């Protein structure tokens, strides 16, 4: 990015008025939350790619690997293991993993909705500036006020939409991973119950 490009961005930010600062804050909160959420769902590597190994791991939990291994060890440890106890422990795992992702998704979707709404606030401010310019009558000062109001109205709306769209894609990626994790937990629970209680 050249110095001229940076200057152009700075000019757009200035022309957008005070609402651009609010949009900058919304963008910062949205992208930090979405990035942290993506890291959270990807880091766990909680998927069924090693499903063929699950039965062996359930029989010998100490050999189980990764996050799947941690969940297996947690859900089957203890002498008096029962289907109800496994269910309860899986509910605890879901409470930690799935509910945590859901809370993050609520924040992300709220910020996605806030970005274009904040942009519309700038649009209203810009239109008011345009009306002030029109009310002032003719002349250079009046035309400058109208031009400034038009820039503010357009730049803030555009910026709000530009902030929201990538956030929406990030939200969809987090939601897709969340559903995959939930599905993997259900499959793992079924595999543990089937393996541990197949003789019952």
Task: List PLM regions with ranges.
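Lipid-exposed faces of alpha-helical membrane segments in multi-pass integral membrane proteins
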Residues: 22-35, 111-121, 163
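Membrane-interfacial helix-loop-helix connectors in multipass membrane proteins
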Residues: 133-147
């Amino acid at each position: 990015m050249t110095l001229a490009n940076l200057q152009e961005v700075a000019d757009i930010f200035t022309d957008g008025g005070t609402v651009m600062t609010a949009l900058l804050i919304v963008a910062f909160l949205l992208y930090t939350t979405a990035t942290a959420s993506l890291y959270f769902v990807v880091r766990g590597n909680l998927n069924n790619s090693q499903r063929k190994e699950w039965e062996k791991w359930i029989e010998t939990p100490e050999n189980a690997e990764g996050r799947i291994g941690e969940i297996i060890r947690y859900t089957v440890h203890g002498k008096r293991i029962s289907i109800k106890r496994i269910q309860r422990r899986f509910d605890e795992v879901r409470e930690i993993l799935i509910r945590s992702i859901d809370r993050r998704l609520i924040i992300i979707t709220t910020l996605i909705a806030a970005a274009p709404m904040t942009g519309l606030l700038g649009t209203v401010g810009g239109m008011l500036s345009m009306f002030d310019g029109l009310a002032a009558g003719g002349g250079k000062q009046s035309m400058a006020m109208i031009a400034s109001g038009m820039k503010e109205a357009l730049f803030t709306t555009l910026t709000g939409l530009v902030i929201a769209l990538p956030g929406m894609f990030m939200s969809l990626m987090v939601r897709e991973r969340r559903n995959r994790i939930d599905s993997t937990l259900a499959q793992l629970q079924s595999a543990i119950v089937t393996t541990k209680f197949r003789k019952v």
